[in-house]
Amino acid sequence: MMIGSQTARDKLGSQVPDIKLKLAGTGPLLEQLKSQCPPNAEFLGFKQGEELRELIHNASFVVVSSECYENNPMTIIESYMIGTPVIGSDLGGIPELIIENKTGYTFKPKSSDDLKETITKACSISEEEYARMSDEAKKFAMDNFSEESHYQKLIKNYQLIIDQNKR
C-alpha cells in the first residue's frame, strides 16, 4: 500500500501492523516523519517513471491522504490508468475522482481513525470485488483521461463553436 501525509502515519502503522506501508516522496519533513513511523513503514524516496508505475502496479491500493485542497491529483489518475484503486481523503477534487465502492474509497480528512477503518474495509473485500474495482478504476481513467477521450471532447467543443458561428 502506498501512502503519505501525517494523518496516514499518525496511528495507522501501529493500528494496522500487518499492512506494509510504502511511502514515496521527499520533502523538508522527511527525517521527522521517519522518526514517527512504525517498523512496517518503508521510505522509498522520490520515484518517477517506470519505477513509480511499478510501485503503483504492485500496490493493493494507493492512499492519497492529502490534508490540503487538491483540484485534480495526478496520482489518482495514474493509479487508475494502471488499474490500482485509490483510498483518498474527502477533500478538494479528490472525491470527484473516486466513485465510492467502485473505483476506491474516501475517508474524512485528518482522521487517522477513519483512514484506518477505510483501509481495513478495503483490505477485507474479496478477490472478485477487488478485480471489479480495479477494472472500474481503469475504465474510469480511460473514459475520462485517455488521449482518445481528450481528443473526442476537444473535437466536440470545436464542432460546437463551428456550428454556433454558422448561424
How should these model regions be labeled?
Residues 31-50:
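Nucleotide-activated donor-binding/catalytic signature segment of Leloir-type glycosyltransferases, i.e.
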Residues 46-47, 55-59:
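Short alpha-helical donor nucleotide-sugar binding micro-motif in glycosyltransferases
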Residues 57-71, 84:
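Acidic donor-binding loop of glycosyltransferase active sites
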Residues 67, 84, 88-95, 109-111:
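Short glycine-rich donor-binding/catalytic loop of glycosyltransferases
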Residues 77, 91-101, 105-106:
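Short acidic/histidine- and often glycine-rich active-site loop of Leloir-type glycosyltransferases
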Residues 100-101, 105-112, 121-127:
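Conserved acidic donor-binding segment of nucleotide-sugar-dependent glycosyltransferases
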Residues 121, 128-144, 150-156:
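A short, well-ordered alpha-helix in the C-terminal region of glycosyltransferases
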